[in-house]
Amino acid sequence: MGIEIKSHDEIALMREAGLVVHEVLDELSKIAAPGITLDELDAVAKRETERRGAACAFIGLYGFPKHICISVNDQVVHGIPGKRKLLDGDLVKLDHGAVVKGWYGDAARTVPVGKISPEAQKLVDATRESLEAAIRAMVPGNRVSDIGAAVQGVIEPHGFGIVRDYVGHGIGKRPHEDPQVPNYGPALWTRGQPNPRLRPGMVLAVEPMINAGTHEVRTLGDGWTVVTRDGRNSAHFEHTIAVTEDGPVVLTGPA
């Protein structure tokens, strides 16, 4: 499939979905405290999404069994909520999608549980800053590679590992569309990977996944949960962003 350019009206519908995602992540962030189970967070995600007239995007997607992806500590992405309780010092990654009138929004954030270590805080801050830098690069005329280069420029001085096996993506009527959006510059890309110019109407889900140690990851036996190969922490932030003539517009931000 080629890159689908969205109209102003379509981007407005995606903003509706994005606002639901933002508000639900806000609700979850408030209650992500020691003692709560991941299943309880999943139930809140379902309730709060549906209460806003939207549907949860991830349940059943490629067979995913829950409403939201929740990954803790060395879990990078695609964690399946269960009976695990959050503990003081955990890093919990909340990755949520919502659908409104057939249009998707997708965002993620890393939430400190209780008091986290200075090293963990540095990882969280750098990952958030790398997403902010990526968003600033999303102007017409730049290329997709400029997004990843912006992430890499923030992360590499810290010595953290940028996950290479999973990348950002286009989004719209489908949760995953072209193009792929790596979180690193083109020197690390697969030979021949498309590197289109950014045009008004492109909507991308940009999501740096940053590890405290190695960039290498592996998938657990459940077929979903991705963890760091060295067992160290990982952080993840994501926004759905529209490229416009006036610059980037974050569709999963606050009202």
Where are these regions (language model features)?
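Active-site neighborhoods and metal-handling regions in enzymes and metal-associated proteins
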Residues: 1-255
